[in-house]
Amino acid sequence: MSTDIAAEAPAVAPLRGSVVWFMALAAALGTSTIYPLQPAIADVAHSFDSSITAVGMALAFGPVGYMSGLGLLVPLVDRWSPRRVLGIQFGVLSLALALTAVISNLLVLGLLIGVAGACSVVGAGLSSVAGRLAPTHRRGTVLGIVTAGISVGILAGRIVGGWLAEEIGWRNMVLVFAAACAIVAVCSVLALPAVRGTSTRGYLATLRSLPGLLLRDTVLRLAGARGALWFFAFCAVWAGLAVALSEPPYAYSAAQIGLFALAGLSGILAAQAAGAWTDRVGARRVILVGLTVAGASATALTFALSSTIATLACLALFDAGLFAAQVANQSTVLAIDPAAPARYNSTYMLVYFVGGSLGTAFGSAAVELVGWSATVVVTAAAIAVAALITLSTGGASAGAGDELTQQKGQAGV
């Protein structure tokens, strides 16, 4: 199916290297806007003369908005030009953040955070652009670069947000993010491709088609299942880690716990490398290697917590393995319909995000109920199931990289 559709995809000018790196930068900024208020939650509560619990509920509108954006906004890049869709999204994101910095009503804060969360899906939109406009033989490489940008955003959002909030106050910190988004909005209009998507399906028809894609397409269904499993594991480990390290015998401060996120730097490097390897050896091999590394690291985390160095090493390998698997897995989704990949990517990311949300809830509660070791064993089991799905499906989970690898082998290359 994917081969036939790929053959019908219209020829477009390849993405220039400078544009790809701008896409990575834009993905980093857009993704980072979900996180900067989290380390400043106490300051926000004091500013609003409210409780941390109430502010936490307002911040919860961000993930809700993000899930809405995955379904409502990401498919737009199949129909309209990336510079138009993403330029507008960054503009609205900038406006929502600017208003967040000046309002004094907690309900309005929640609504604005929801709008910002919806527009912060620009990373998923840019991934879809990579799938549509990158040459087939470089799709994994380009996707790896964009995903590395998303990884930077996940890591930098909390760190930069917390630092700026401490230095200039949380309102000025949000204004800095708003100004950056305004600049990127203008640059998006100037730098991103102007080519319109070839999809003739109406917007409402596209939205109605999303649930059915999972039922009809085996590749999407398998990719979604294993992606949700390992994102469940990823979020459970990091959510559980914060709880475990905050309690005796560790009793680390929030700042000390936050420094463990630096282990996520490995994910940035792994994402970029995994893209190139996916183009060379195929998605399935990269997924299996990534899951093997992540599963072994999760198992080691059951007894590594007493050593900071061992914990950081395990977390670095854990993140690297899962980010590598994510790049390869997403490349199989984008290869299903290269002419209009956004609705497949939107559906995949929705399933993926649901897995992560369940993992966050599980990780925090499980450490309290059954302890750190039992929690991590469950995450390792989830990764093992994802690996078994990949092993058992064979060609059904193959993406464009796997097809190219097979063609090279048949040609004796």
How would you label these PLM feature ranges?
Residues 113-150:
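Cytoplasmic helix-loop-helix junction between adjacent transmembrane helices
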Residues 68-106:
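Conserved MFS/SLC helix-loop-helix module at the cytosolic interface between two early adjacent transmembrane helices
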Residues 85-98, 178, 285-299, 380:
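Structural signature of the two symmetry-related core transmembrane helices
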Residues 6-14, 193-225:
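Juxtamembrane intracellular "pre-TM" segments in multi-pass secondary transporters
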Residues 285-329:
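C-terminal transmembrane helical hairpin of 12-TM major facilitator-type secondary transporters
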Residues 122-134, 324-337:
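Intracellular juxtamembrane helix-capping segments at the cytosolic ends
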